Amino acid sequence: MLFARLVLLLVYLAPGSLAKPASTKKRTQWDQIAIDACAKELESHKFDTDVKGRHATLCTYEPALGSWLHCAKDVLDSRKKSKKIFEKTFSKINQYCHDYHKDEVVSNEEYYRIFANASLFIRPLDEVKENIRYPVTPNKASLDRWVWAYFGPLDNIDKGNVYGVTICLYWIGVLFIAAVYHFLNFSRLKQTVFKNKVSAFLRGHYVLPALVHNHAMSVGRWFFIGLVPTRLETLVLFGYVLLHGFLLSSYNFDHNELLSDRRSQVLIFLSDRAGILAFAHFPLIVLFGGKNSTMTWLTGIRYTAFITYHKWLGRFMLVDCTIHAIGYTYHAYIENYWKYVKYSDLWTSGRHAMIIVGILVFFSFFFFRRHYYELFVITHIILAIGFFHACWKHCYKLGWGEWIMACALFWIADRILRLIKIAIFGMPWAKLKLCGESMIEVRISKSSKWWKAEPGQYIYLYFLRPKIFWQSHPFTVMDSLVEDGELVVVITVKNGLTKKLQEYLLESEGYTEMRVLAEGPYGQSTRTHLFESLLFIAGGAGVPGPLSMAIKAGRQVKSNDSHQMIKFVWSVRNLDLLEVYRKEIMVLKELNIDTKIYFTGERKDESNTEEGAIANMSTEGRLLTTSKSAEMITDFGRPNIDEIIEEAVSGAKSLLVTCCGSEGFVDKTRELTAKRVLEHGDKWIEYVEEFQNW
């Protein structure tokens, strides 16, 4: 996606896109509220003057002006505002009275003189009904109604700004708690603190399990498919949804309806609040949608979880945008100003933003991500460009552009870090070899001593061929056991990029060399030395992560002469996979790691010919006569994961279960591990899932 990223960078650097928007300011200015509320209240009474015009009486008739100043002072004093705020009302009066004073600006000293003079003669307004000839103080109850009427709309916007920050603080709190929990992994303190029945109950019921049964495996049928969060992710999202709902439901309406009726207030207040909250989602969506290697390192939250939060934040941003758009559109119709605003830049950019974000969310459905991933990525980036630009145009005269600026800052920082990772790795040659019918082995010579990947980490590979150079996919990376300074990536052929690589290799007689770029590494390696027992479970092509981690743990045990128990279990149905990883499996055995390989290939019935008689041998016999890799197989059929986990935990005080495989395989392992956590509250059982699906 290099081209699309360059396009996005150009959009951000375009002069029009970087035009400085109006800054977001506090709207509740009490000097303004006091002046406006007092003007409304005083102008509802008749002073002894015949001057005409807006605020003419208050500006030109000194008893009225003195009343205005005293009224404003009383309003500000009741809110304990400073003398400086009171003096700001002088400049507001100068603005309102400019037409009557011509080019003359009344000084603060003159206003204080008028105020002092009025203090000598001021009376309560209730004592006179008409033709007022002296300064008066308005009825407090009547004045307060006007104060509240002006305060409500401004306070609503200010609260929206505070609530937008509140949403961000909620997620900062989530990240902080995750970071504290994660950094306990660097010591045995975590096992001491959390090794009890209460912790086991919480972890077994709410932290580890999927929401129902599926997490990695999609649910639904046909177009309506999707991924379900874990229970912990669901709890985090549920807290966010509750907070979001509360922040959309608290308003200070003017029940006296002095400035507008209740319907208009509901529409405007709700629309303003929703619009501000929508903008507050910008930095969170970009932050969680990036590769976030730093965020993962700090918090221990997997990329899959960040993408889950990214998706749900995007959906609720769409909800906020929809409320904002429908509310203002309906208000424009009922107040009969739609025809005057519908073609303005403000409304046009708002319509464009709504259309774009709707299409963006639609093409983000899991159906497109699964079946048309490259289409999804292209449309996602291009539509994001359009949405950001439309929102920028929509708000640059109003304020709230700071949210988009923060969003751009996170995006640029993420891209810079990714480019640095690519630059550090360099552009080495890679050797590609076709292994069997559905696998490609990629061997890459590391060209930089600064680049290092830990077991279980993955990289995004770019193959520099004309038709595919712009595509990248994540692959788990391993250090070669044959050549120092060489990385090994084994690719399972599916559709898209991997299919094109397979076709190119078939044209090249199964082998070729090409230059590659690598972005990463991402993910993190688990601190296996903190556990008494280690269980690595792999299914099919999900073996690289658990296998490399098992080898590293075995070497640490050997060098430290420790008594850590390590078991490696691999369920495989493809002999080609066994051949690809034969050297690594042999290393496991050399390290005396308990290795169990279960072959789940289908049994085939052949004819009863003499050749068929050989084919009708037991599966074990056929394998032993057809493959050198068959000698590594220890069992046939599916492994009993439940028994394997129970066996691993029974002889240890702490257990780490690491799993990677197909969707159903890892979901089942997660469920069974959570079950064991509940059963063994006196032991520390941790589960690490290497499989990632988004």
UniProtKB/Swiss-Prot annotation:
Domain (Ferric oxidoreductase) ranges: 274-408
One family from Pfam that matches here is: NAD_binding_6
**Annotated TM spans:** 164-184, 223-243, 268-288, 312-334, 348-368, 372-392, 404-424
- Going by the entry's taxonomy, the superkingdom of the source organism is recorded as Eukaryota
Tell me which positions the record assigns to the signal sequence.
1-19
Cytoplasmic topology: which positions? 185-222, 289-311, 369-371, 425-694
GO CC aspect terms: mitochondrion; plasma membrane
Q: Which residues bind FAD?
A: H473, P474, F475, T476, V477, M478, D479
Which InterPro entries does this UniProt record tie to the protein? Answer: FAD-bd_8, FAD-bd_FR_type, Fe3_Rdtase_TM_dom, Fe_red_NAD-bd_6, Ferric/Cupric_Reductase, FNR_nucleotide-bd, Riboflavin_synthase-like_b-brl
Residues that, per the record, bind NADP(+):
G520, P521, Y522, G523, C660, G661
Subcellular localization is given as: Cell membrane
Record's note on what induces expression: By iron deprivation.
Outline the extent of the FAD-binding FR-type domain.
409-528
Q: Which UniProt keywords apply?
A: Cell membrane, Electron transport, FAD, Flavoprotein, Glycoprotein, Heme, Ion transport, Iron, Membrane, Metal-binding, NADP, Oxidoreductase, Signal, Transmembrane, Transmembrane helix, Transport
The entry marks the following residues as binding heme 2, namely H324, H394
Residue spans, topological domain Extracellular: 20-163, 244-267, 335-347, 393-403
EC main class here is oxidoreductase
Q: Which PANTHER family match?
A: FERRIC REDUCTASE TRANSMEMBRANE COMPONENT 3-RELATED, FERRIC/CUPRIC REDUCTASE TRANSMEMBRANE COMPONENT
What name appears for this protein in its UniProt entry? Answer: Ferric reductase transmembrane component 5
